[in-house]
Amino acid sequence: GFFPGQALALVGEKHAAKSLTQAIITELLGGRCARPYQAMLGNTAFNADWFEAEHLCIEDEAPRTELRTRRKLGVGIKMATANGGQRCRGMYKDAIELNPFWRLSMSLNDDAEHLMVLPPLDESLSDKIMLLKCRKHPMPMPTGTPAEKKVFWDALMLELPAFIHHLLDEWSVPDAIREDRFGVRYYHHPAILEAMSAQSPEQRLLDLIDMEVFRSDAPGPETMRAIDVEKKLTRWDS
């Protein structure tokens, strides 16, 4: 039956094997992936390709950082991770409801622009996404040429059966992080949360207020209505 699972966001510097990790996840889930980003944002009404894959993969997408767009992505993440029945619609086909098995992953760089692709982590979303910090490390085998990359990938694939056996038959979720709904408690890396907070609309508004109130020629403390603060911050010369 249906069992929900959190989305996985891999966030880190360039060349930190984020896309490689997603490729391994695809193989672990059966070897098929779909690209849900555009449909989640409402740029297309068709999503039948999602139902041909187990891994919903978001990577190397043109970043969209508008708050409305980020909230749409958040709705899509909640839908893909927590809902059993899913609406499937193909081109020139009637929509039907199906019950797929999906796991969603995202990879993005940790610069300010790409971090703002992530949706705001409100109470309804925070437990449905993992935020993991990725760092660059030397590969265990040479990967400087296409031929070397293929040898490395083939070696990884040879290890997958043993890795799957370890996950299914030898390893179990520690009690300290076990959680009933998703099986494991969500985790948000503190550095990612801090960086997201620094770029949030609320923090940017606070920065604007600080720039206005604490500038060198600003008057002393004063009481103002919210509408007056907005007018003051949006003056052409402020």
What are these regions (language model features)?
Residues T21-I25, K72-A80, F101, S124-K128, ...:
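Alpha-helical scaffold elements adjacent to nucleotide-binding pockets in ATP/GTP-utilizing enzyme cores
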Residues G12-K14, L29, D60-A62, T81, ...:
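Short, flexible loop/turn elements at secondary-structure junctions
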Residues K18-S19, E66, E113-V117:
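SF2 helicase motor core recognition
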Residues F46-E97:
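Conserved nucleotide-sensing/catalytic segment adjacent to the nucleotide-binding pocket
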Residues G1-I58, M130-K133, L167-L168, V229-E230:
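P-loop NTPase catalytic core of nucleic-acid-dependent motor ATPases
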Residues G12, M40-N47, R89-A95, L115-P120:
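Catalytic micro-motifs at enzyme active sites that drive phosphoryl/nucleotidyl and oxygen chemistry
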Residues V11-H15, V75, P174-S238:
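DNA transaction DNA-binding modules
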Residues E97-R103, D111, V117-A198, F214:
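Phosphate-sensing "switch" segment of ASCE/P-loop ATPases
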